[in-house]
């Protein structure tokens, strides 16, 4: 998997005909962050920020995953979503 394939997938996911389910969006978000930033580097959001906590927890769950593995999983998930939702 190359950086170019990853960047293409990042653009394609924005053009899906239907918004993916929340769990699919968390997968996409967390793997994108792991691939581009690496291990989480922020504090967990406060108790009232439910969406922020869900995103933080999903990204934190990937701690230790290599950028390459996160990139590969991201690309594979986008391909799956393209088949499911169309672009």
Swiss-Prot record:
Main location: endoplasmic reticulum
Keyword Transcription: no
Keyword Phosphoprotein (UniProt): yes
Gene3D superfamilies to which the protein is assigned, alphabetical: 1.20.80.10
Domain ACB: 2-87
Subcellular location: Endoplasmic reticulum; Golgi apparatus
Annotated SUPFAM superfamilies: Acyl-CoA binding protein (SSF47027)
PROSITE patterns associated with the record: ACB_1 (PS00880), ACB_2 (PS51228)
CDD domains from the UniProt entry: ACBP
Keywords: Acetylation, Antibiotic, Antimicrobial, Endoplasmic reticulum, Golgi apparatus, Hydroxylation, Lipid-binding, Phosphoprotein, Transport
Entry-annotated residues carrying N6-(2-hydroxyisobutyryl)lysine: 55
InterPro entries per record: Acyl-CoA-binding_prot_CS, Acyl-CoA-binding_protein, Acyl-CoA-binding_sf, FERM/acyl-CoA-bd_prot_sf
Modified residues (Phosphotyrosine): 29
Residue positions, PTM N6-succinyllysine: 8, 17, 55, 77
Binding locations of an acyl-CoA: 14, 29-33, 51, 55, 74
N6-malonyllysine modification, residue list: 55
Function: Binds medium- and long-chain acyl-CoA esters with very high affinity and may function as an intracellular carrier of acyl-CoA esters. It is also able to displace diazepam from the benzodiazepine (BZD) recognition site located on the GABA type A receptor. It is therefore possible that this protein also acts as a neuropeptide to modulate the action of the GABA receptor.
Family that this chain belongs to: Belongs to the ACBP family.
Subunit structure: Monomer.
Protein name: Acyl-CoA-binding protein
């Amino acid at each position: 998997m190359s950086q170019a394939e990853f960047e293409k997938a990042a653009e394609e996911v924005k053009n899906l005909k239907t918004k993916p389910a929340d769990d699919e969006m968390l997968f996409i978000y967390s793997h994108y962050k792991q691939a581009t930033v690496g291990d989480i580097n922020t504090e967990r959001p406060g108790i009232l920020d439910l969406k922020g906590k869900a995103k933080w927890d999903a990204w934190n769950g990937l701690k230790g995953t290599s950028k390459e593995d996160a990139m590969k999983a991201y690309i594979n998930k986008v391909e799956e979503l393209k088949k499911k939702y169309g672009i």
